[in-house]
Amino acid sequence: RWQSPKYIIGESYGGTRVMGLAAELQNKQWMYLNGVIMVSPADYKVLRTDSALSSSLNLPYYTAAAWYHKMLPDELQNKDLLEILPLSENYAINVLIPAMAKGGFISETDRNETAERISYFSGIKKKVVLQHNLDIPKNYFWKELLREKNGLTIGRLDSRYKGLDKRIAGDKPDYNSEITSWLHSFTPAINYYVREHLNFKTDVTYNVFGPVRPWDNRNDNVRDGLRQAMAQNPYLKVLIQSGYYDGATTYFNAKYTMWQTDPSGRMRDRFFFKGYRSGHMMYLRNEDLIQANEDLRTFLKESSANGKAAKY
């Protein structure tokens, strides 16, 4: 199939891997890809930077989760999600990052104004934002958002799910509510299918979530590998698919990764981003399963290159 269009797709940690794999295949195997598809990519490079950046990039996700649970001010809550996310994104990039960069040297006036806007876009009370020096950790957000409404927590990988903790007090949820729901659904399904349909009999436990540690990703530089692969191969295009309610690999962090992969901006027309009203696994929502598949089909059709050689 060397003459066929070639694509690789990776989800979550796999999103990081396919960025590196694209460069590896091209440089070591001389295999030139047509497309790289990243589903909820886990590019944690930004999380190792100062919190001024990583915390600011969380805000649009907070807006999405708060909107879903009806915790935003009426001015935002009464609008559609896709109307308010650009407002939160614009504030995060153009106002919040510069404010957070000042750290403890921000003026009291600016500190209070910033806390007010973070509260406005996140559903978290201004007093709580100030108590956290304008930096609300995601663990705390999942615990705090509904604390006074119903005492429930919200999920990490998909914040549409709710959980019930031992105590309403605390700074993080007791468990990831979405995980228990997925395990409850997937575990009996796969075990039934393997045994009854494939007739494969075994007592080995099927791990829905396999062990992934220990690992060392401190030297992760796959972004630049993908950039180089794209520079050398003008027919290589990239599609990123993210769920707005994913609190682990947030959609805005994925956008930031996309922007930073090509600092020159000369390949920006070869990057495509699609967002969905779901979490980490957007295909669990039937409407997004249909739309995500359609987006994939469109991407494949528009990136086949018809067998052209990799040259400008």
Predicted regions and their residues:
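Alpha/beta-hydrolase fold catalytic core
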Residues: 102-249
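Catalytic nucleophile loop
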Residues: 14-19
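Short alpha-helix in the alpha/beta-hydrolase fold that links the catalytic acid
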Residues: 20, 236, 250-260
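Alpha/beta-hydrolase fold nucleophile elbow
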Residues: 2-13
